[in-house]
């Protein structure tokens, strides 16, 4: 069942919000596949996702931006209501990840820190992202290979 959700999310990304992911990836120098993988892990790409955590904090949008970030986003005019706008959410998620990469380098630790503050939880999260990335990359390679064959063969 989980594989179906990942496939649906990847299909959804290919049409909706593709430009948002491309723009954020370029702006923050982060692979677009990584941003899509994080969105898939966070919410299965659900732009309207709003979740309350055990500690009472709230996560918004497909990148699940925690309300802890709101005071830092306020000077840029970004409110919790704007965080459910897919392109804004994508860019804020990329901005947060870019800060994590600046702190930890382009490592799995940085990717894990997008979601978790402790080492073990970072590792668990990074592994989830890695699994989705593998799926994205294998599907991309498959599409490339299929696209190289003459249509009569397909």
Which stretches of residues belong to each language-model region?
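Catalytic glycan-binding domains that act on GlcNAc-containing polysaccharides
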Residues: 19-154
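Sec-dependent N-terminal signal peptides
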Residues: 6-8
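Positively charged n-region of N-terminal signal peptides that target proteins for export
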Residues: 1-4
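N-terminal signal peptide c-region/cleavage motif recognized by signal peptidases
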Residues: 11-16
